[in-house]
Regions:
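Acetyl-CoA-dependent GNAT
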Residues: 33-92, 103-104, 109, 163-165
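Conserved acetyl-CoA-binding loop-helix of GNAT-fold acetyltransferases
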Residues: 95-108, 131-135
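Conserved catalytic-core motifs of GNAT/GCN5-like acyltransferases
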Residues: 69-72, 119-122, 134, 139-156, ...
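A short beta-loop-alpha structural element at the N-terminal edge
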Residues: 2-16
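Conserved GNAT acetyl-CoA-binding A-motif
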Residues: 110-122
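Acidic/histidine-enriched, glycine/proline-rich intrinsically disordered or flexible terminal extensions
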Residues: 166-178
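Helix-loop element at the rim of GNAT/NAT acetyltransferase active sites that forms part
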Residues: 18-35
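Conserved beta-strand-loop-alpha-helix junction that forms the acyl-donor binding cleft
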Residues: 94, 120-130
Length: 178
C-alpha cells in the first residue's frame, strides 16, 4: 500500500512536475500546453496548501508516484464550501489501488475542513477517470461541449460532483484551514 502524506512544496515539486508533465505533453487530459517547471509547482502547492489539501503517494521505495489536491471551485464567497479536485498518477501506478487511496484520503481531508461539495472536470472521453470518480459517488452534472482545443481537436469537459457531507440547515460554518 502506498504511503500518503501532505506534499512538501520544495521537496516534492520535481516529482509532481515530472508526473504532470507527461499528461501535458502526451495527452489531452489537461489543457495546459507547456509542462510547468518544478519551481512553478512549488509555488502552486505552497499557495494552495493554505486553504486546501495537496497530497502525494509514495511507493515502497519512497518515490512519489502520484498526487491529488483540492482547490477553490470559484473565488466568490458563496462557493467556499465547494472544492475542485484533481488526481494524477504515473502510468505504472494505475490500477493498483493508489488512486483510490489517494482520493479517499483527500475527500476525508476536505470533509474534516467542513467542505460540502467536490467538483471534478474531466476531459472526455476518459473512461478510466470517469470510472474512478463514479466509484466514489460522483454524479455527472453537465458537459462543456467543445470548450478546449488541444492536439488538433476541440474537446469536451464533463463535470462531476460529489456531496461530501449534507448541507446544514441555516448558515453553514465557514470551512476550516487544513
Amino acid at each position: 500500500m502506498p504511503r500518503l502524506r501532505s506534499a512538501d512544496p520544495q521537496n516534492d515539486a520535481a516529482a509532481i512536475a515530472a508526473i504532470y508533465g507527461e499528461f501535458v505533453r502526451d495527452t489531452v487530459i489537461t489543457f495546459e500546453s507547456d509542462p510547468p517547471s518544478p519551481g512553478e509547482f512549488a509555488a502552486r502547492v505552497g499557495r494552495t496548501q493554505h486553504t486546501h489539501p495537496w497530497l502525494v503517494a509514495e511507493n515502497e521505495e519512497g518515490r512519489v508516484v502520484g498526487f491529488a489536491y483540492g482547490c477553490p471551485h470559484r473565488e466568490r464567497v458563496a462557493y467556499r464550501w465547494a472544492a475542485d479536485v484533481s488526481i494524477y498518477l504515473e502510468p505504472a501506478s494505475h490500477r493498483r489501488g493508489i488512486g483510490k487511496a489517494l482520493y479517499g484520503t483527500l475527500f476525508d481531508c476536505l470533509r474534516a475542513q467542513g467542505l460540502l461539495i467536490a467538483c471534478a472536470g474531466i476531459t472526455l472521453p476518459n473512461e478510466a477517470s470517469v470510472a474512478l470518480h463514479r466509484s466514489f459517488g460522483f454524479v455527472p452534472v453537465g458537459v462543456y461541449q467543445n470548450i478546449g482545443y488541444k492536439s488538433g481537436a476541440w474537446r469536451d469537459v464533463g463535470w462531476y460532483q460529489l456531496e461530501l457531507a449534507p448541507r446544514p440547515d441555516g448558515d453553514p460554518p465557514p470551512p476550516r484551514k487544513p
